[in-house]
């Protein structure tokens, strides 16, 4: 089954403007070039000179106190993300004094990323894991700790005229706006073909993990992006240059590339979805659903306290995952930005099978559960049990969505939805499609097992046979 509804050329772009070629353009043609000194970033804004201590990322602790953790949202330390938010706020508040005022004036004031959705709009995403990743409360805490605290400590820098001071609510709103603009439009300011030696004294590239400098690049962010694309931003020594990857005919849109992102992640980061990105859709399968299916097969034979110990032992493995990501196999775009064969679901992740086996070992060790003992001793039985359990978990995961795949396809075909509703339906529909493909794959695997057992001529009445009705 195709992962996309037939005759559904969905494409909801991040920008209202679509950049099209006015005439035929040959491959490898430079479209425009942006000098690095015109990029808005920590290296070009005067804010760095006004509050240099805030921009000092060279120390090992990056400004952390002895009691602060680098991952603590309440930490006052800065990173490339928060520094750029501070820079944009500073330049925005400067008004006419900022050399980037014309650019800042055309940045969107509203965004379609789920961060700005109402509770009713978010509910349209149903059971998609992206809902938990919106993180507005976390963002509010980060802004209060790393943005508002800096602005309040340096009000003479951000508000040279006391009459222009913003209250905390206004600052929070402005910080969210700038943070969303960064997520949608910012570039990592690395250079192509960079080497360690070349970067030792390079102000554009931070050598600490997660500290690559971010910048807003006027012109470069006018290009929309898709999974199939025809242009690329080359990072040169002195400039960023947009270049065509293949011939573009007059009237065709010029498209950049943001990476192999799922529909949900594309929506979360950039506030739009496209049909071609559906090939990269993923579904998170919570481990608790797998465990629940396994427990149902030994109900009444094990004490609840035993299950708690089994669960604790299984989770003590350093590689234990709370959720397993399911995805299709998809080849990378070629050098011209084009996609080849269709994306295909080719199997369950190896880590799911390993975690399942680890749980059986824990069940054997803690309570000597007969089913676990037999499954560990018989590879075919273990695979059969594994497929049964995973199929049940996949079916339960699909039922967590309040509408069916068919319901969503009818909604998309019928039309009449708001933009945000349609994007939400598209995201949840793609995840259900992937769940269906995974279930089909499991059933085929189970069918092949039965056929092989039949070909061997052995009686199908062993311990696993009683559970093989998939």
Where are these regions (language model features)?
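Internal, well-ordered alpha/beta segment that forms a basic, Gly-enriched binding/recognition surface
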Residues: 69-121
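Long, positively charged leader/targeting segments at protein N-termini
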Residues: 1-38, 43-46, 98, 102-470
């Amino acid at each position: 089954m195709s992962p996309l509804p037939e005759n559904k050329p969905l494409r909801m772009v991040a920008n209202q403007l679509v950049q099209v070629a006015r005439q035929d353009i040959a491959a490898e043609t430079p479209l425009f070039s942006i000098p690095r000194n015109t990029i808005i970033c920590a290296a070009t804004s005067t804010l760095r000179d006004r509050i240099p201590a805030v921009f000092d990322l060279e120390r090992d602790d990056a400004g952390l106190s002895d009691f602060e953790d680098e991952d603590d949202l309440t930490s006052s330390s800065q990173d490339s993300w928060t520094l750029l938010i501070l820079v944009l706020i500073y330049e925005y508040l400067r008004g006419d004094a900022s050399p980037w005022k014309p650019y800042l004036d055309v940045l969107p004031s509203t965004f379609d990323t789920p961060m700005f959705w109402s509770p009713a709009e978010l509910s349209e995403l149903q059971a998609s894991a992206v809902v938990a990743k919106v993180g507005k409360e976390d963002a509010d805490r980060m802004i209060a700790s790393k943005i508002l605290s800096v602005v309040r400590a340096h009000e003479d820098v951000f508000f040279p005229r006391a009459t222009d001071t913003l209250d905390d609510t206004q600052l929070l709103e402005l910080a969210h706006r700038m943070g969303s603009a960064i997520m949608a439009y910012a570039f990592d300011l690395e250079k192509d073909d960079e080497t360690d030696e070349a970067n030792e004294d390079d102000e554009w590239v931070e050598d600490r993990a997660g500290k690559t400098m971010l910048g807003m690049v006027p012109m470069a962010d006018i290009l929309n992006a898709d999974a199939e694309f025809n242009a690329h931003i080359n990072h040169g020594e002195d400039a960023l240059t947009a270049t065509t990857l293949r011939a573009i005919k007059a009237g065709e849109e010029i498209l950049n590339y943001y990476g192999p992102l799922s529909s949900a992640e594309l929506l979360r980061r950039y506030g739009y979805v496209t049909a071609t990105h559906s090939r990269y859709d993923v579904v998170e399968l919570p481990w608790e659903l797998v465990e629940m299916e396994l427990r149902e097969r030994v109900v009444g034979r094990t004490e609840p306290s035993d299950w708690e110990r089994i669960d604790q032992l299984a989770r003590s493995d350093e590689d234990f995952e709370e959720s397993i990501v399911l995805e299709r196999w998809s080849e990378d775009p070629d050098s011209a930005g084009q996609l080849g064969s269709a994306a295909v679901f080719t199997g369950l992740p190896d880590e799911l099978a390993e975690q399942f086996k680890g749980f059986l070992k824990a069940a054997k060790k803690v309570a000597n559960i007969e089913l676990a003992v037999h499954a560990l001793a018989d590879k075919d039985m273990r695979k059969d049990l594994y497929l049964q359990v995973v199929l049940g978990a996949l079916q339960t995961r699909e039922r967590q969505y309040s509408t069916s795949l068919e319901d969503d396809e009818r909604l998309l075909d019928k039309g009449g939805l708001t933009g945000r509703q349609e994007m939400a339906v598209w995201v949840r529909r793609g995840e259900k499609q992937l769940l269906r493909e995974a279930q089909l794959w499991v059933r085929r695997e189970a069918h092949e097992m039965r056929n092989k057992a039949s070909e061997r001529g052995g009686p199908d009445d062993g311990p696993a046979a009683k559970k093989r009705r998939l």
